Curated annotation (Swiss-Prot):
Subcellular location per the Swiss-Prot or TrEMBL entry: Cytoplasm
The protein's name in its UniProt record: Adenosylmethionine-8-amino-7-oxononanoate aminotransferase
Assembly description: Homodimer.
Residues that hold pyridoxal 5'-phosphate according to the record: 126-127, 256, 319-320
Pathway membership: Cofactor biosynthesis; biotin biosynthesis; 7,8-diaminononanoate from 8-amino-7-oxononanoate (SAM route): step 1/1
UniProt cross-references to Gene3D superfamilies, sorted A to Z: Aspartate Aminotransferase, domain 1, Type I PLP-dependent aspartate aminotransferase-like (Major domain)
Gene: bioA
Record keyword Transferase present: yes
Keywords: Aminotransferase, Biotin biosynthesis, Cytoplasm, Pyridoxal phosphate, S-adenosyl-L-methionine, Transferase
Highest rank taxon of the organism: Bacteria
Amino acid sequence: MSGATSGLTPEQIGAIDAAHLWHPYSTIGAATGVIPPVVAVAAHGAWLTLIRDGKPIEALDAMSSWWTAIHGHGHSVLDAALTTQLGAMNHVMFGGLTHEPAARLAQLLVDITPAGLETVFFSDSGSVSVQVAVKMALQYWRSRGQPAKRRLMTWRGGYHGDTLTPMSICDPDGGMHSLWTDILARQVFAPQVPRDYDPAYSKAFETQLAQHTPELAAVVVEPVVQGAGGMRFHDPRYLCDVRDICRRHDVLLIFDEIATGFGRTGELFAADHCGVSPDIMCVGKALTGGYLSLAATLCTTDIAHAISVGAAGALMHGPTFMANPLACAVSVASVEVLLGQDWRSRVAEISAGLTAGLEAAQGLPGVIDVRVCGAIGVIECDRSVDLAVATPAALDRRVWLRPFRNLVYAMPPYICPPAEIAQITSAMVEVAGLVG
Protein backbone atom coordinates (compact mmCIF):
# COMPACT_ATOMS: atom_id res chain seq x y z
CA MET A 1 0.00 0.00 0.00
CA SER A 2 2.87 2.37 0.75
CA GLY A 3 4.14 2.05 -2.83
CA ALA A 4 0.71 2.82 -4.26
CA THR A 5 0.43 5.97 -2.14
CA SER A 6 4.03 7.22 -2.57
CA GLY A 7 4.78 6.76 1.10
CA LEU A 8 1.88 8.86 2.41
CA THR A 9 -0.50 7.41 4.95
CA PRO A 10 -4.23 7.63 4.24
CA GLU A 11 -4.46 10.27 6.96
CA GLN A 12 -1.76 12.36 5.28
CA ILE A 13 -3.46 12.00 1.91
CA GLY A 14 -6.74 13.18 3.41
CA ALA A 15 -5.12 16.16 5.10
CA ILE A 16 -3.34 17.32 1.94
CA ASP A 17 -6.53 16.76 -0.05
CA ALA A 18 -8.62 18.84 2.34
CA ALA A 19 -6.12 21.69 2.26
CA HIS A 20 -5.21 21.84 -1.40
CA LEU A 21 -7.29 19.72 -3.80
CA TRP A 22 -10.38 20.55 -5.78
CA HIS A 23 -12.63 17.63 -6.75
CA PRO A 24 -15.38 17.69 -9.40
CA TYR A 25 -18.09 20.14 -8.33
CA SER A 26 -16.56 20.51 -4.88
CA THR A 27 -15.64 22.98 -2.18
CA ILE A 28 -12.15 23.43 -0.78
CA GLY A 29 -11.47 22.46 2.80
CA ALA A 30 -13.69 20.86 5.39
CA ALA A 31 -16.90 22.72 4.58
CA THR A 32 -19.88 22.08 6.81
CA GLY A 33 -21.90 19.07 5.71
CA VAL A 34 -19.39 17.91 3.09
CA ILE A 35 -18.10 14.38 3.51
CA PRO A 36 -14.40 13.94 2.76
CA PRO A 37 -13.40 11.84 -0.26
CA VAL A 38 -12.59 8.19 0.29
CA VAL A 39 -8.93 7.31 -0.20
CA ALA A 40 -8.33 4.80 -3.01
CA VAL A 41 -5.08 2.83 -2.98
CA ALA A 42 -5.49 0.19 -5.69
CA ALA A 43 -7.79 -1.06 -8.44
CA HIS A 44 -7.87 -4.52 -10.00
CA GLY A 45 -10.56 -6.02 -12.20
CA ALA A 46 -13.93 -4.59 -11.21
CA TRP A 47 -12.75 -3.91 -7.66
CA LEU A 48 -11.37 -0.84 -5.91
CA THR A 49 -9.28 -0.99 -2.74
CA LEU A 50 -10.48 1.84 -0.52
CA ILE A 51 -9.57 2.97 2.98
CA ARG A 52 -12.51 2.95 5.37
CA ASP A 53 -12.12 3.59 9.08
CA GLY A 54 -8.38 3.29 8.64
CA LYS A 55 -8.53 -0.15 7.04
CA PRO A 56 -8.52 -1.32 3.40
CA ILE A 57 -11.75 -2.73 1.99
CA GLU A 58 -12.67 -4.03 -1.47
CA ALA A 59 -15.61 -2.41 -3.26
CA LEU A 60 -17.09 -3.00 -6.70
CA ASP A 61 -16.55 -0.09 -9.07
CA ALA A 62 -20.19 0.18 -10.14
CA MET A 63 -19.44 3.46 -11.93
CA SER A 64 -16.61 2.09 -14.13
CA SER A 65 -14.72 5.09 -12.74
CA TRP A 66 -17.13 7.52 -14.36
CA TRP A 67 -18.03 5.30 -17.28
CA THR A 68 -14.50 4.67 -18.56
CA ALA A 69 -13.17 1.34 -17.27
CA ILE A 70 -15.26 -0.99 -19.42
CA HIS A 71 -12.70 -3.82 -19.08
CA GLY A 72 -12.13 -3.18 -15.39
CA HIS A 73 -8.79 -2.10 -13.96
CA GLY A 74 -5.36 -3.54 -14.66
CA HIS A 75 -6.31 -5.48 -17.78
CA SER A 76 -3.26 -7.43 -18.93
CA VAL A 77 -3.60 -6.53 -22.63
CA LEU A 78 -4.02 -2.83 -21.94
CA ASP A 79 -1.17 -2.89 -19.42
CA ALA A 80 1.09 -4.51 -22.01
CA ALA A 81 0.14 -2.01 -24.72
CA LEU A 82 0.90 0.89 -22.42
CA THR A 83 4.20 -0.60 -21.24
CA THR A 84 5.33 -1.38 -24.78
CA GLN A 85 4.52 2.11 -26.00
CA LEU A 86 6.21 3.66 -22.98
CA GLY A 87 9.38 1.84 -23.93
CA ALA A 88 9.28 3.35 -27.40
CA MET A 89 7.90 6.88 -27.09
CA ASN A 90 5.92 8.53 -24.33
CA HIS A 91 4.98 11.74 -26.13
CA VAL A 92 5.81 13.88 -29.13
CA MET A 93 4.12 17.00 -30.36
CA PHE A 94 1.52 16.34 -33.06
CA GLY A 95 2.34 19.55 -34.89
CA GLY A 96 4.42 18.48 -37.87
CA LEU A 97 4.89 14.93 -36.56
CA THR A 98 2.78 11.78 -36.70
CA HIS A 99 3.14 8.25 -35.34
CA GLU A 100 1.81 4.71 -35.56
CA PRO A 101 -0.50 4.72 -32.50
CA ALA A 102 -2.39 7.74 -33.86
CA ALA A 103 -2.62 6.25 -37.35
CA ARG A 104 -3.82 2.89 -36.07
CA LEU A 105 -6.42 4.41 -33.78
CA ALA A 106 -7.70 6.79 -36.45
CA GLN A 107 -8.15 3.95 -38.94
CA LEU A 108 -9.85 1.80 -36.30
CA LEU A 109 -12.31 4.55 -35.40
CA VAL A 110 -13.11 5.27 -39.04
CA ASP A 111 -13.75 1.55 -39.56
CA ILE A 112 -16.15 1.07 -36.62
CA THR A 113 -18.07 4.35 -36.37
CA PRO A 114 -21.14 5.13 -38.50
CA ALA A 115 -20.56 5.34 -42.24
CA GLY A 116 -19.23 8.58 -43.66
CA LEU A 117 -17.13 9.70 -40.69
CA GLU A 118 -13.72 9.71 -42.34
CA THR A 119 -11.52 12.21 -40.48
CA VAL A 120 -10.42 12.19 -36.84
CA PHE A 121 -9.31 14.97 -34.47
CA PHE A 122 -7.83 13.80 -31.16
CA SER A 123 -8.21 15.90 -28.01
CA ASP A 124 -7.75 15.57 -24.27
CA SER A 125 -11.30 15.22 -22.95
CA GLY A 126 -14.94 14.88 -23.85
CA SER A 127 -15.68 18.55 -23.24
CA VAL A 128 -12.90 19.56 -25.62
CA SER A 129 -14.11 17.09 -28.24
CA VAL A 130 -17.52 18.80 -28.17
CA GLN A 131 -15.83 22.18 -28.39
CA VAL A 132 -13.91 20.95 -31.45
CA ALA A 133 -17.13 19.60 -33.00
CA VAL A 134 -18.77 23.00 -32.67
CA LYS A 135 -15.71 24.76 -34.12
CA MET A 136 -15.84 22.35 -37.05
CA ALA A 137 -19.47 23.27 -37.65
CA LEU A 138 -18.85 27.01 -37.38
CA GLN A 139 -15.80 26.92 -39.66
CA TYR A 140 -17.73 24.80 -42.15
CA TRP A 141 -20.44 27.41 -42.53
CA ARG A 142 -17.92 30.24 -42.72
CA SER A 143 -16.18 28.37 -45.50
CA ARG A 144 -19.55 27.96 -47.22
CA GLY A 145 -20.09 31.73 -47.07
CA GLN A 146 -22.80 31.55 -44.40
CA PRO A 147 -21.20 33.01 -41.24
CA ALA A 148 -24.63 33.85 -39.79
CA LYS A 149 -25.14 30.14 -39.10
CA ARG A 150 -23.52 30.19 -35.67
CA ARG A 151 -26.14 29.03 -33.17
CA LEU A 152 -26.78 25.51 -31.91
CA MET A 153 -30.00 23.63 -31.19
CA THR A 154 -30.44 20.79 -28.75
CA TRP A 155 -32.93 18.99 -26.54
CA ARG A 156 -33.46 20.12 -22.98
CA GLY A 157 -32.10 17.71 -20.39
CA GLY A 158 -28.70 17.28 -22.00
CA TYR A 159 -25.13 17.51 -20.77
CA HIS A 160 -22.14 18.09 -23.05
CA GLY A 161 -19.28 19.21 -20.80
CA ASP A 162 -17.92 21.93 -18.57
CA THR A 163 -16.10 24.25 -20.98
CA LEU A 164 -17.93 27.35 -22.16
CA THR A 165 -19.43 26.28 -25.48
CA PRO A 166 -20.48 22.80 -24.28
CA MET A 167 -21.97 24.48 -21.19
CA SER A 168 -24.16 26.59 -23.45
CA ILE A 169 -25.94 23.47 -24.78
CA CYS A 170 -26.39 21.77 -21.41
CA ASP A 171 -29.87 21.98 -19.91
CA PRO A 172 -30.38 25.69 -19.11
CA ASP A 173 -32.66 25.11 -16.12
CA GLY A 174 -32.01 21.74 -14.49
CA GLY A 175 -28.36 21.49 -15.53
CA MET A 176 -25.22 22.35 -13.61
CA HIS A 177 -24.37 25.63 -15.33
CA SER A 178 -27.14 28.08 -14.45
CA LEU A 179 -24.52 30.23 -12.67
CA TRP A 180 -23.11 31.17 -16.07
CA THR A 181 -26.36 31.90 -17.92
CA ASP A 182 -25.55 35.58 -18.43
CA ILE A 183 -22.22 34.88 -20.18
CA LEU A 184 -23.03 31.79 -22.23
CA ALA A 185 -24.02 31.91 -25.88
CA ARG A 186 -27.79 31.88 -26.41
CA GLN A 187 -28.69 28.57 -28.01
CA VAL A 188 -32.01 27.09 -29.15
CA PHE A 189 -33.56 24.52 -26.82
CA ALA A 190 -36.30 22.11 -27.86
CA PRO A 191 -38.47 20.50 -25.17
CA GLN A 192 -37.22 17.39 -23.40
CA VAL A 193 -37.26 14.44 -25.80
CA PRO A 194 -39.83 11.85 -24.60
CA ARG A 195 -38.88 8.30 -23.68
CA ASP A 196 -41.50 6.75 -25.95
CA TYR A 197 -41.80 7.55 -29.61
CA ASP A 198 -44.29 10.25 -30.60
CA PRO A 199 -44.18 11.56 -34.19
CA ALA A 200 -45.83 14.75 -32.97
CA TYR A 201 -42.69 15.59 -30.99
CA SER A 202 -40.52 15.35 -34.08
CA LYS A 203 -42.98 17.46 -36.05
CA ALA A 204 -42.87 20.16 -33.37
CA PHE A 205 -39.07 19.91 -33.28
CA GLU A 206 -38.92 20.54 -37.02
CA THR A 207 -41.29 23.49 -36.75
CA GLN A 208 -39.09 25.06 -34.08
CA LEU A 209 -35.90 24.35 -36.04
CA ALA A 210 -37.34 25.87 -39.22
CA GLN A 211 -37.84 29.17 -37.40
CA HIS A 212 -34.09 29.38 -36.78
CA THR A 213 -32.61 27.73 -39.89
CA PRO A 214 -30.77 30.84 -41.20
CA GLU A 215 -28.81 31.10 -37.93
CA LEU A 216 -28.40 27.41 -37.03
CA ALA A 217 -25.01 25.78 -37.54
CA ALA A 218 -25.84 22.42 -35.99
CA VAL A 219 -28.12 20.31 -33.86
CA VAL A 220 -26.21 18.63 -31.01
CA VAL A 221 -27.76 15.66 -29.18
CA GLU A 222 -26.82 12.70 -27.01
CA PRO A 223 -28.25 9.69 -28.84
CA VAL A 224 -30.50 7.26 -26.92
CA VAL A 225 -29.14 8.24 -23.47
CA GLN A 226 -28.89 11.73 -22.02
CA GLY A 227 -26.18 11.13 -19.43
CA ALA A 228 -25.16 13.56 -16.71
CA GLY A 229 -28.16 15.77 -17.46
CA GLY A 230 -30.48 13.20 -15.89
CA MET A 231 -29.77 9.67 -17.17
CA ARG A 232 -32.84 9.77 -19.42
CA PHE A 233 -33.46 7.35 -22.29
CA HIS A 234 -35.36 7.90 -25.52
CA ASP A 235 -36.58 5.89 -28.48
CA PRO A 236 -33.91 5.63 -31.22
CA ARG A 237 -36.47 6.61 -33.85
CA TYR A 238 -36.02 10.21 -32.75
CA LEU A 239 -32.48 9.99 -34.12
CA CYS A 240 -33.81 8.99 -37.53
CA ASP A 241 -36.21 11.92 -37.43
CA VAL A 242 -33.62 14.50 -36.39
CA ARG A 243 -31.26 13.19 -39.08
CA ASP A 244 -33.93 13.72 -41.74
CA ILE A 245 -34.91 17.11 -40.34
CA CYS A 246 -31.34 18.40 -40.35
CA ARG A 247 -30.81 17.21 -43.90
CA ARG A 248 -34.01 18.88 -45.12
CA HIS A 249 -33.09 22.22 -43.54
CA ASP A 250 -29.35 22.23 -44.29
CA VAL A 251 -28.25 22.05 -40.66
CA LEU A 252 -25.37 19.86 -39.48
CA LEU A 253 -26.01 17.05 -37.00
CA ILE A 254 -23.57 16.35 -34.14
CA PHE A 255 -23.86 13.23 -31.98
CA ASP A 256 -22.24 13.35 -28.54
CA GLU A 257 -21.39 9.68 -27.93
CA ILE A 258 -18.89 10.33 -25.16
CA ALA A 259 -20.94 8.40 -22.59
CA THR A 260 -22.71 5.97 -24.94
CA GLY A 261 -19.91 4.83 -27.22
CA PHE A 262 -18.19 1.44 -27.19
CA GLY A 263 -21.12 -0.79 -26.37
CA ARG A 264 -22.69 0.82 -23.32
CA THR A 265 -26.26 0.93 -24.75
CA GLY A 266 -26.15 -2.52 -26.34
CA GLU A 267 -24.92 -1.31 -29.73
CA LEU A 268 -21.32 -0.36 -30.44
CA PHE A 269 -22.49 3.24 -30.77
CA ALA A 270 -25.93 4.55 -29.85
CA ALA A 271 -26.37 5.81 -33.41
CA ASP A 272 -26.33 2.18 -34.53
CA HIS A 273 -29.72 1.58 -32.87
CA CYS A 274 -31.35 3.24 -35.88
CA GLY A 275 -28.55 3.05 -38.43
CA VAL A 276 -28.03 6.77 -38.93
CA SER A 277 -24.81 8.70 -39.43
CA PRO A 278 -24.26 12.19 -38.02
CA ASP A 279 -22.09 14.76 -39.76
CA ILE A 280 -19.84 15.02 -36.71
CA MET A 281 -19.47 12.64 -33.76
CA CYS A 282 -17.66 12.86 -30.42
CA VAL A 283 -16.30 9.85 -28.52
CA GLY A 284 -14.32 9.61 -25.29
CA LYS A 285 -14.59 8.11 -21.79
CA ALA A 286 -14.37 4.36 -22.58
CA LEU A 287 -12.10 5.02 -25.56
CA THR A 288 -8.94 4.33 -23.55
CA GLY A 289 -10.55 1.75 -21.28
CA GLY A 290 -10.14 4.15 -18.38
CA TYR A 291 -6.35 4.36 -18.54
CA LEU A 292 -5.68 7.88 -19.84
CA SER A 293 -7.65 10.91 -20.94
CA LEU A 294 -8.37 10.94 -24.67
CA ALA A 295 -11.31 11.87 -26.87
CA ALA A 296 -11.92 12.09 -30.58
CA THR A 297 -14.08 14.17 -32.88
CA LEU A 298 -14.90 12.59 -36.24
CA CYS A 299 -16.44 14.32 -39.23
CA THR A 300 -17.26 13.71 -42.88
CA THR A 301 -14.83 14.37 -45.71
CA ASP A 302 -17.16 17.08 -47.00
CA ILE A 303 -16.88 19.03 -43.75
CA ALA A 304 -13.14 18.47 -43.52
CA HIS A 305 -12.61 19.64 -47.09
CA ALA A 306 -14.73 22.77 -46.65
CA ILE A 307 -12.78 23.73 -43.53
CA SER A 308 -9.45 23.06 -45.23
CA VAL A 309 -10.15 25.31 -48.22
CA GLY A 310 -11.80 28.06 -46.18
CA ALA A 311 -10.31 31.44 -45.35
CA ALA A 312 -8.49 30.15 -42.27
CA GLY A 313 -6.91 27.36 -44.28
CA ALA A 314 -6.97 25.00 -41.29
CA LEU A 315 -9.13 23.76 -38.44
CA MET A 316 -8.25 26.28 -35.75
CA HIS A 317 -7.59 24.03 -32.78
CA GLY A 318 -4.46 22.24 -31.55
CA PRO A 319 -4.06 20.73 -28.05
CA THR A 320 -0.57 20.32 -26.58
CA PHE A 321 -1.11 16.63 -25.85
CA MET A 322 -3.04 15.94 -29.05
CA ALA A 323 -2.80 12.27 -30.09
CA ASN A 324 -0.55 11.36 -27.16
CA PRO A 325 1.10 8.06 -28.18
CA LEU A 326 0.44 6.38 -24.83
CA ALA A 327 -3.25 7.25 -24.92
CA CYS A 328 -3.59 6.22 -28.56
CA ALA A 329 -1.79 2.90 -28.01
CA VAL A 330 -3.91 1.91 -25.03
CA SER A 331 -7.06 2.99 -26.91
CA VAL A 332 -6.22 0.68 -29.80
CA ALA A 333 -5.75 -2.14 -27.30
CA SER A 334 -9.01 -1.34 -25.51
CA VAL A 335 -11.08 -1.26 -28.70
CA GLU A 336 -9.46 -4.46 -29.97
CA VAL A 337 -10.17 -6.22 -26.67
CA LEU A 338 -13.80 -5.10 -26.91
CA LEU A 339 -14.22 -6.20 -30.51
CA GLY A 340 -12.39 -9.47 -29.89
CA GLN A 341 -15.00 -10.75 -27.45
CA ASP A 342 -18.74 -11.32 -27.48
CA TRP A 343 -19.40 -7.92 -25.97
CA ARG A 344 -23.04 -7.88 -27.07
CA SER A 345 -23.79 -10.94 -24.96
CA ARG A 346 -21.91 -9.46 -22.00
CA VAL A 347 -23.84 -6.20 -22.17
CA ALA A 348 -27.12 -8.08 -22.64
CA GLU A 349 -26.35 -10.23 -19.59
CA ILE A 350 -25.56 -7.14 -17.51
CA SER A 351 -28.75 -5.48 -18.76
CA ALA A 352 -30.81 -8.50 -17.72
CA GLY A 353 -29.13 -8.52 -14.31
CA LEU A 354 -29.77 -4.83 -13.77
CA THR A 355 -33.41 -5.22 -14.81
CA ALA A 356 -33.98 -8.15 -12.47
CA GLY A 357 -32.09 -6.67 -9.53
CA LEU A 358 -33.62 -3.22 -9.70
CA GLU A 359 -37.15 -4.61 -9.80
CA ALA A 360 -37.03 -4.52 -5.99
CA ALA A 361 -36.87 -0.71 -6.13
CA GLN A 362 -40.24 -0.48 -7.85
CA GLY A 363 -42.77 0.79 -5.35
CA LEU A 364 -40.26 1.95 -2.75
CA PRO A 365 -41.30 5.18 -1.03
CA GLY A 366 -39.68 8.07 -2.86
CA VAL A 367 -38.85 6.10 -6.02
CA ILE A 368 -40.54 7.55 -9.10
CA ASP A 369 -38.89 5.52 -11.86
CA VAL A 370 -36.60 2.56 -12.49
CA ARG A 371 -35.04 2.20 -15.94
CA VAL A 372 -32.37 0.19 -17.73
CA CYS A 373 -30.69 0.68 -21.11
CA GLY A 374 -27.93 -1.72 -22.00
CA ALA A 375 -25.37 -1.71 -19.19
CA ILE A 376 -26.92 1.33 -17.50
CA GLY A 377 -29.26 1.03 -14.53
CA VAL A 378 -31.06 3.99 -12.95
CA ILE A 379 -33.30 4.53 -9.94
CA GLU A 380 -34.88 7.97 -9.98
CA CYS A 381 -36.05 9.34 -6.64
CA ASP A 382 -38.39 12.19 -5.81
CA ARG A 383 -35.72 14.10 -3.88
CA SER A 384 -31.97 14.55 -3.81
CA VAL A 385 -29.82 11.67 -2.60
CA ASP A 386 -27.75 12.51 0.49
CA LEU A 387 -24.20 11.34 -0.24
CA ALA A 388 -23.40 11.36 3.47
CA VAL A 389 -25.97 8.58 3.82
CA ALA A 390 -25.67 6.90 0.43
CA THR A 391 -21.90 6.42 0.30
CA PRO A 392 -21.50 4.51 3.58
CA ALA A 393 -24.64 2.48 2.89
CA ALA A 394 -23.25 1.33 -0.45
CA LEU A 395 -19.82 0.63 1.04
CA ASP A 396 -21.50 -1.52 3.70
CA ARG A 397 -22.42 -3.75 0.76
CA ARG A 398 -18.93 -3.40 -0.72
CA VAL A 399 -20.06 -1.30 -3.69
CA TRP A 400 -18.80 2.10 -4.83
CA LEU A 401 -21.70 4.24 -6.07
CA ARG A 402 -21.74 7.94 -6.82
CA PRO A 403 -25.36 9.14 -6.96
CA PHE A 404 -26.02 12.65 -8.20
CA ARG A 405 -29.00 14.88 -7.60
CA ASN A 406 -31.99 12.50 -7.31
CA LEU A 407 -30.44 9.57 -9.19
CA VAL A 408 -28.94 6.32 -7.96
CA TYR A 409 -27.35 4.70 -10.99
CA ALA A 410 -24.69 2.27 -12.15
CA MET A 411 -22.65 1.76 -15.31
CA PRO A 412 -20.55 -1.27 -14.34
CA PRO A 413 -17.54 -2.73 -16.14
CA TYR A 414 -18.44 -5.31 -18.77
CA ILE A 415 -16.38 -7.94 -16.93
CA CYS A 416 -18.82 -8.13 -14.00
CA PRO A 417 -20.46 -11.57 -13.70
CA PRO A 418 -24.11 -11.94 -12.62
CA ALA A 419 -23.22 -12.24 -8.92
CA GLU A 420 -21.43 -8.90 -8.96
CA ILE A 421 -24.27 -7.23 -10.85
CA ALA A 422 -26.63 -8.58 -8.17
CA GLN A 423 -24.37 -7.11 -5.50
CA ILE A 424 -24.47 -3.74 -7.25
CA THR A 425 -28.25 -3.70 -7.65
CA SER A 426 -28.70 -4.74 -4.02
CA ALA A 427 -26.65 -1.72 -2.95
CA MET A 428 -28.60 0.56 -5.29
CA VAL A 429 -31.93 -0.59 -3.89
CA GLU A 430 -30.59 -0.17 -0.35
CA VAL A 431 -29.52 3.40 -1.06
CA ALA A 432 -32.80 4.26 -2.80
CA GLY A 433 -34.69 2.88 0.18
CA LEU A 434 -32.92 5.37 2.44
CA VAL A 435 -34.09 8.31 0.33
CA GLY A 436 -37.81 7.84 0.78
